From Swiss-Prot:
Maintained in an autoinhibited state via homodimerization in which the CARD domain forms an extensive interaction with the adjacent linker and coiled-coil regions. Activation downstream of T-cell receptor (TCR) by phosphorylation by PRKCB and PRKCQ triggers CARD11 homooligomerization and BCL10 recruitment, followed by activation of NF-kappa-B. Residues 614-625 have a biased composition (Low complexity). Residues 973-1140 form the Guanylate kinase-like domain. It comes from the Eukaryota. Residues 18-110 form the CARD domain. This is Caspase recruitment domain-containing protein 11.
Amino acid sequence: MPGGGPEMDDYMETLKDEEDALWENVECNRHMLSRYINPAKLTPYLRQCKVIDEQDEDEVLNAPMLPSKINRAGRLLDILHTKGQRGYVVFLESLEFYYPELYKLVTGKEPTRRFSTIVVEEGHEGLTHFLMNEVIKLQQQMKAKDLQRCELLARLRQLEDEKKQMTLTRVELLTFQERYYKMKEERDSYNDELVKVKDDNYNLAMRYAQLSEEKNMAVMRSRDLQLEIDQLKHRLNKMEEECKLERNQSLKLKNDIENRPKKEQVLELERENEMLKTKNQELQSIIQAGKRSLPDSDKAILDILEHDRKEALEDRQELVNRIYNLQEEARQAEELRDKYLEEKEDLELKCSTLGKDCEMYKHRMNTVMLQLEEVERERDQAFHSRDEAQTQYSQCLIEKDKYRKQIRELEEKNDEMRIEMVRREACIVNLESKLRRLSKDSNNLDQSLPRNLPVTIISQDFGDASPRTNGQEADDSSTSEESPEDSKYFLPYHPPQRRMNLKGIQLQRAKSPISLKRTSDFQAKGHEEEGTDASPSSCGSLPITNSFTKMQPPRSRSSIMSITAEPPGNDSIVRRYKEDAPHRSTVEEDNDSGGFDALDLDDDSHERYSFGPSSIHSSSSSHQSEGLDAYDLEQVNLMFRKFSLERPFRPSVTSVGHVRGPGPSVQHTTLNGDSLTSQLTLLGGNARGSFVHSVKPGSLAEKAGLREGHQLLLLEGCIRGERQSVPLDTCTKEEAHWTIQRCSGPVTLHYKVNHEGYRKLVKDMEDGLITSGDSFYIRLNLNISSQLDACTMSLKCDDVVHVRDTMYQDRHEWLCARVDPFTDHDLDMGTIPSYSRAQQLLLVKLQRLMHRGSREEVDGTHHTLRALRNTLQPEEALSTSDPRVSPRLSRASFLFGQLLQFVSRSENKYKRMNSNERVRIISGSPLGSLARSSLDATKLLTEKQEELDPESELGKNLSLIPYSLVRAFYCERRRPVLFTPTVLAKTLVQRLLNSGGAMEFTICKSDIVTRDEFLRRQKTETIIYSREKNPNAFECIAPANIEAVAAKNKHCLLEAGIGCTRDLIKSNIYPIVLFIRVCEKNIKRFRKLLPRPETEEEFLRVCRLKEKELEALPCLYATVEPDMWGSVEELLRVVKDKIGEEQRKTIWVDEDQL
C-alpha cells in the first residue's frame, strides 16, 4: 500500500498522544499517588496481570537507591509509564481495588471493580484465587490486630501499675529531698566545726612553735652550763692534786720532827761522853805509870801491844773515816733520792693533770661533735619538716578540692542509686503484678486467639524477628509488655528477643526440662500465691522453655534468671522482712542487716524451702576477675551451707567445770525417732545435763516410762541417715534439740532418774541465776555488729564471752555475756548469731574482703541486701545426689580452698587484720572440739568426695571457725614477756633493763651445751629457744630457766619469737605477748631501736610478715598502737603499763590450737 506508511505513522502518533494524555493525568496527581501508595500491595496484582516481571518487582522493592516508600512508588510509576496504555489500564484497576479514593481522584469516576485485565489474562479462576489470597491476608492482619489489642490492654494495665508506682516514687523523692536538705544543714554545721577545729589546730601549732623556741633556748643554756661544769671539774682536779702533794710533804716533815731526839736525851748523852773521856784519861795515866815500873820484858810486850794498839787505832780510824765517807755518801744519796722523789711527784702531778685535761678536752670535743651532729640533724629535720609541711599543705589543698568533688559526686551517686533502687523495687512489683495477671488471663488469652492461627505467626511474635518478605514493613506498635527499665536492671538477652507471653509458654511447656512434679506443684500453689508478695527469686522461678533457656546470660545473676522451678511459699523472705520491719527507712534498707530477720525460721521451714542463690552472685564480675565462675561459687556456698547446718556447735567436756557424781542405775528404752520431737520437750544444757521437761500424755514416750525430771544420757540410732551415738549429757541445748529433731527409725534413749538435779535446774532458772543449762566460754574470730548482724550485742574480734543459752527464745541465737578481763565476771548481756549462722557471716565477710576494690562493687550495692537474705538462710542444702552438686564437688572444694588461700596471703591478712571487718582465720584440726562438729557435719559429703578424688583435702579446707572454745587459767607469779616483731625484741629488752627496770625485769640465763647434749635434750625435753654459738656448742633456754626467773618474782624478757608460745603453754608457762604495731605513720620512730640499718620498706615488709603469726596464737595478745607513744621513752613506759595490765588479766587459752 503506497499510502500505508504515512497513515500508520499518524496512527501511532495519535496513540502516543492519547497515552501521553492519559499519563498526563497521572503525572498531575503523582505527588498524591507516590505519597499514599504502598508498592508492596500493588506489585502482586501487577505481576499477575503480567505488566511487570520479577526483576521489575525486585528493583522497586529492594533497590538500595530507593530508601523511602515515596521513591519506590515513583519508580513503580516510571516503570508502568514505559508499558504504555496497558500499564495505565492495569495501574488504574489496581488503584480501583486497593485505593478507591485515589482511583476517583485520577479518573473522576466511581470504582466498579470489574478486573477486566486479570479476567482476560488469568480467567475467572485466577481472579478468584487472587481474591482468596487477599482475603487470607486480611484475616491474618485482623488476627494480628486482635492480638495487638490484647497486648495493648495488658500494656494499659501495666501503665496503670507504673502510674501507681510513680506516685510512690514521688513520695519517696520528696522524702529524699527533705533528707537532702537536712544533710546539707548538717554539712554546713560540720563545716563550721571544721573551721573551728582548724583554728584550734593553728593555735596549737603556734604554741608548739613557741615551745620549740623555748626548748632550743634551754638547750643552749644547758650547753653553756655544761661547759662551765667541765671547767670547774678541771680546777677541782688540779686543786686535789696540789692538796695531795702538800699533804705528802707535810707528813714527811712532821715525821722528821717527831723522830728528832729530845733535849734531855742530848744533855744526858753529852754527860756520858764527858764521863767516858774522863775515864779514858785516867786509864791512859794508869797505863803510863805502869810502863815506868814494869821490867824490860814486860816493856817489850807493852811496846808490842802499844804498837798493835796504834795499828788497831789506825785501822779503826780508817774504818771510822770510811764509815764517815759512807755516811756522807748515804746522806748525799738520800738527798738525791728525796730530790728525785719530789721531782717524781711533781711529774706525776703534771701527768695526772695533763691526763685529766686530755680526758676533759676529749669529752668536750665529743660533746661538741654530738651537739654539732644533733644541730645538723635538727637542721636537716627542720628543712625536711618544712618541705614536708609545704608539700603536705599543697597536698591537703589538692585533696580538699578532690574530696569536695568526690562528696558532690557521691551525693549525686547516692541520690541516683536510691532512685534506681526505688525503680527496681517498682520493677519487681511490676513483674509480680504481671505474673499474677498472666496466671489469671491465661485462659482468656487461649480464647482470644483464633484456633486456626498458623504457627508461623506465633513464631514470628515470640521468636527471632524474621526478615520481611516482599518489602512489607513492621507493625506500627510493639507487642512487648516489658517495661522500658527492664534492660537497665536485668541482664540483656543475647541476641535481643521479644519477651514470651503465656501463650508461647504453653505451646512448648511439654518440652521443658523441668520435672513435671515441680510444675504441678507450682500450678497447684499458684492461687495461694496471688494475695502475697513474692520475692524476686520466686518471680523468676517459672518453668520456662528450652528456647528461653538459650536466651539466658552465660552466668547467673540472681534467682530471677534461675532455671530451677522453686514455688514461693508463705515464708517469703522479702514479705517477712517487710512485715517484721515496716517502719524501717530506706537508708536502713541499704545496710546489710535486713537479711537476718528471716533467719528465725524453724527447722521445718528449713527443710521445706530452699531459697535463692547466695551472696556470692552479688559480685559476679569480681569473681570473674579472680578466675572463678558464678556456678562454681554457687556450689561452694551450697556445700558450706550444708556443712554449717549439719550439726550445731559442741563444746568439749573439758570446758565445763561441772563434775557429775555417780547417780542411780542407768535405764534405757526404744522409741520411734520420727515422732520423738512431738512427744517430749527438753530442758538443760552442757553444764547441767539434758532433762525431760514434759511428756505428751498418752504418747509412746510416756508408755515407755519417760517422765519429767529424767536425765538423758545417751541416744543411739539413725540420725540423718547415719548410725550414731550422741552423749546427750554433754550436749548443748541447741545440739540436743537438733539431734532429737533429726532422728529417724527406732532409737534407744539411755536415761536415769535425777529429780534433784532437775529441781535445782528449774529453781535456778526461776530465780534468774541461769538462763539455761548451757555454760562455756568462746573467743570471737570476727567482728559482730548489733545493727548489721541481726543481734543485740556488738563485739570485736578476740573478745571473750560467756555463752549462757544456745537457743535463746527458741531462735537461732546465743545468749551470752561479755566477760570482764580482770575478774571473769559477766558484764552486759545480749545475743549473738549461732555457730552455723556465724560461719555464714564469716564467709560473707571474707567475700567482702576478697571483692574489695572492684570497680563493680558500687554497681552491685543494690544486691547486698538481697544477697545477704539469700545467703544467711538456715536452709537445708541440696542432697549429695543432686546432679548439679556431685559432679563438681571436687571443683567447688578446690575453689573454696582457693578462697581461703586468697584471704590467707600476707598482704590480705594485713588488710583483714587492720580493717573494720576484721576476721581471724585459724586452721581447724579434726581433733579440736570446734572442728569435731565440723568433721561430723562433713563426714557424709567427704565420703562422696573421696569416691571422686581419694586425695581430696576437703575436710582440711573447710575450717571456717567463727568462735573458738577457750578455757581460763590463772597465774600468780610474774609471767614471761615475748615481743613481736622479733627484730625489736633485743633492743627493747636492753632499754627496759637500762631504764631502771632491773627490779621488775630480767633476762633469762641460758644453758651452754655441746651439740650431742643439745640433740639429746631436744628429744627428751622441751627447748623454748636455741641458738648455735659455735659449731660445737649451743645456747638454749628450757622451761626450767624461765621458772627460775619467775621464782624471783620478776618478768623474764625473752628475745625469742612468738613461735615458742605453744611450747610455753604446754609447759604450764603462760607468756605475755606484746605486739608493737608498725605502720607507715610511725616507722620513722623505730630508727633508734633497729639493731642494724635497714630500709623502711624492708622493715615494714618484715613486720607485716611477722604480724600474720598472731592469728595462730592459742592465747590473747596485747597491742601497742602507734598513737600511744611518740618517743622511745614513752614506748618503754607504755610497754611497762601493758605488761602490768596483762599480768592482772585472766589468761584465756584455746586448747584446740595447742
